[in-house]
Each structure stands twice: as C-alpha cells, then as structure tokens.
Amino acid sequence: MDGEKVKLRLENISQSFITNNRVFDAAVDVSLDVKDNEFLVILGPGRCGKTVLLNMIAGIEKPVDGRILLDGEEINGSDERIGMVFQKRALMPWKTVMENVEFGLKLKGVPKDERRAVAQKYIDLVGLQGFEKSYPDALSGGMKQRVSIARAYTNNPEILLMDEPFGALDAQTRYAMEEEVQRIWQTEKRTVIFVTNNIEEAVYLADRIVLLTNCPAKVKAVYDVNLPRPRDTVDPEFLRLRKEISENTDLAL
C-alpha cells in the first residue's frame, strides 16, 4: 500500500494511569500510519493495551505524550469523522432497530424522512430488512452487532473503529459476522481499524496487521496480508502467515 494517502497518523503516543498510587504504563511510544480505505487490524494478547489505543484514537482518552493526526490535522477529543463499534453492544433496549440506527442522525437534527432513508439503507446492507420494528431483546447476538454496525455507518464516519466486536459471539456466528463485515467494508470502502486477540480473525480480515507486545503496548511487528478475498482459511499461505504471527505473539501472563 505504498504511496497511498495516510488517513490517520499516530506519532509517538503513550498512555499511563495512576493505580494504587503507582504509575501504570498502558502504551509506550506507539507510532503508526493508517492508509485511506485500509482495513487495519491491531492484534495483541489480552489486556495488552489494544483498547487503550483505540480509545485514544476515538478521543475517549487523551494520550499523555505524542499526537494523533487525521488528514494531517491534530485531533483532540471526540471527532464526528470517527465512529466506533464496541464488543458490548451499546443499543438502547427501549428503542426499535430503526430508532437505534437513526439515533445519531436524529441528534444532528436531520429531518425524519431523510434520516429514515439513510438508516434503511444500512439496515438493508447488514441484512436486517424486516426487523426495523423489532426491539434488541428479540434479536440474537449477531443481529444486535449488525444493528451496531448499521448505526455506526449511518453516521457516515470516515474512520470506523471496531473494538473486538465479535469477541462475545459463538464461533459459528463470529465467522458469519467476519464475512459480513468484510462484505460491508468492500461495499462502503471506509477506513477500518479493527482490534482483536484472535490471530485467524486478523489474517482473515486485514490488509495489514499491527502486532503489539504485551502490556505496555508497543508495536512489535507489522504484516502485510497479500491474500485474495474472500480468504480461504486452509490456504497454505494463510496457514503460514498465521503460524508466523502466532510464534511472534507474546503470551498474556
């Protein structure tokens, strides 16, 4: 992906917290370029600081050192150009699928007919047509995550952050959602930064994989994934890359 536009740049960012009167380093001197329309996966062992990095990009937390640039301009705090999908599906249980998906546009004052048309487009895109009037309690885990993805896309983000969005799903549903998010990304072509601790998931989805060390998070290696889509998980090159990354991944202690 050399020569492609840099959409997001992390320059020497670090994060630390005070815990029990001691300084806890969560991320140290992380630098990273994310290309426009790239599907970038941040991979690392559990509790290594992946989510901390994502929270800094989202503006939920401010780095103690370094800076974050979006289209060459430093960002501080939340930015409407960045959307986020969490592992825990933050849906409003008292609102229908349509009301959840259109909620961000409603807050922006978008007229009802216009926001409903946009929301319907993404409800259809994630395969939930016919469930517009359903409430979250009536949906499966995978369907709830589809609602979260549709809601994020409805707000028209330039960058979509996904924090282990399929971690709580069973294996079969997780695989189906991996296929689905790849299809949606190929249709919409937004920049996606996807966090996971699952090596096979990373190789299946990514254009590039950024492997982090155990906590505090540092960039340990970067892998280009030059495999055709849709990917075959038993392809020899897929298996070779998965093995190489596995052997280079720190254990979570």
Question: Where are the regions that the model predicts?
Answer:
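Helix-to-loop junction immediately C-terminal to a conserved catalytic motif
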Residues: 58
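Conserved ABC transporter NBD signature motif
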Residues: 66-78
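A short, proline-enriched helix->beta-strand linker immediately N-terminal to the Walker B motif
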Residues: 154-158
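Conserved ABC ATPase signature
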Residues: 135-139, 143
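Catalytic Walker B motif of ABC-type/P-loop ATPase nucleotide-binding domains
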Residues: 160-163
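Conserved ABC ATPase "signature" region
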Residues: 106, 113-131
